[in-house]
């Protein structure tokens, strides 16, 4: 779905582990790394798209994660001119993205990048929370900075958050 301004509706996915690290994946056959993301199909909600992309790109199911937060607004980035396909109609000049912060509830071994015949990624690793902002391709950097800043209050190491909940439960 491309809007009247030429932006394709898309979701981005930040997956955190209990240590507050984030899932960072290498694009298949390339040297670039990014968060999972994908386009919204006609009739899909952003949440439905997120779960579909999570399964297609990372091999995880809804029960493998917990939604912690979603971005308040759609965040946009423009594609560099060299990446715009002028022969398609309508012409897509960039992405507008709704972002989701997920907590991983399964084992690392459950991640399967080869769920589809055309995998998006060929490797992945856990990285520190702010690492992607400096490492993503330059045209996505502002969106990554904005979404990571928005999610930061929710993304402190989850094990510490759960310890705090237990601490306050025991004080009552």
Swiss-Prot record:
Family the UniProt entry places it in: Belongs to the Nudix hydrolase family. RppH subfamily.
Keyword Hydrolase: yes
Enzyme Commission number(s): 3.6.1.-
Lineage: Bacteria, Pseudomonadati, Pseudomonadota, Gammaproteobacteria, Alteromonadales
InterPro entries per the UniProt record, alphabetical: Nudix_hydrolase, NUDIX_hydrolase-like_dom_sf, NUDIX_hydrolase_CS, NUDIX_hydrolase_dom, RppH
Organism whose genome encodes this protein: Pseudoalteromonas translucida (strain TAC 125)
Protein name: RNA pyrophosphohydrolase
NCBIfam families linked: PRK00714.1-1, PRK00714.1-3, PRK00714.1-4, PRK00714.1-5
Keyword Hydrolase found: yes
Pfam families per record: NUDIX
GO biological process: mRNA catabolic process
Signal sequence segment: none
This protein's GO CC annotations: cytoplasm
Enzyme class, first EC level, given as a word: hydrolase
Ranges where the Nudix hydrolase domain occurs: 6-149
Position of sequence motif Nudix box: 38-59
Cofactor(s) this protein cannot do without: a divalent metal cation
Gene Ontology molecular function, alphabetical: mRNA 5'-diphosphatase activity
Stated role: Accelerates the degradation of transcripts by removing pyrophosphate from the 5'-end of triphosphorylated RNA, leading to a more labile monophosphorylated state that can stimulate subsequent ribonuclease cleavage.
Keywords annotated in UniProt: Hydrolase
